[in-house]
């Protein structure tokens, strides 16, 4: 499917600028925001593959780093689910503030700790986030938020992943 927009974006969130990759096929009203896990980035081959497939199916994608380069080096920030949740919520608001995306349906694809932040953001924004997909996620890291999640959630785990299953 032909892409209408394919660009690197810089998203202001508080005192930092987050970097991401935005791909928008023609004639769509759906956006999937990717929240990757600790130790990964928007360049994750797995997430890029899933994003490419979603683009081919006519869905827009935003692969975003929820931490700056400096923050991702510090172990504490990589596992700060509250910070990651707030950043993901801010990124979601940023998308909805863009006139072209105002009426888009938003879903979150979270991997590992990114799934915990996706669930946290969904608990804060039930009317804005329409679905959450967790790939190898850690919903246990979002326990306080789980009772508040009203959004449909799909949990995908590997059968040999003892930490997850």
For each feature predicted by the language model, list its residue ranges:
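A conserved short beta-strand
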Residues: 127-139
């Amino acid at each position: 499917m032909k892409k209408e927009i394919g660009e690197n974006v810089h998203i202001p969130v508080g005192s930092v600028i987050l970097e991401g990759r935005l791909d928008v096929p023609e004639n769509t009203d759906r956006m999937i925001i990717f929240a990757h896990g600790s130790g990964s980035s928007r360049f994750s081959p797995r997430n890029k593959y899933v994003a490419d497939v979603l683009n081919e199916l006519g869905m827009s994608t935003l692969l975003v780093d929820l931490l700056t380069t400096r923050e991702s080096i510090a172990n504490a920030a990589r596992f700060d689910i509250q910070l990651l949740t707030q950043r993901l919520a801010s990124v979601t608001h940023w998308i909805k503030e863009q006139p072209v995306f105002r009426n888009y349906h938003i879903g979150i694809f979270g991997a590992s700790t990114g799934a915990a932040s996706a669930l946290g953001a969904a608990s804060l924004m039930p009317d804005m986030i329409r679905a959450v997909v967790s790939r190898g996620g850690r919903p246990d890291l979002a326990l306080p938020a789980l009772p508040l999640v009203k959004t449909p959630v799909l949990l995908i785990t590997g059968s040999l992943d003892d930490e997850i299953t």
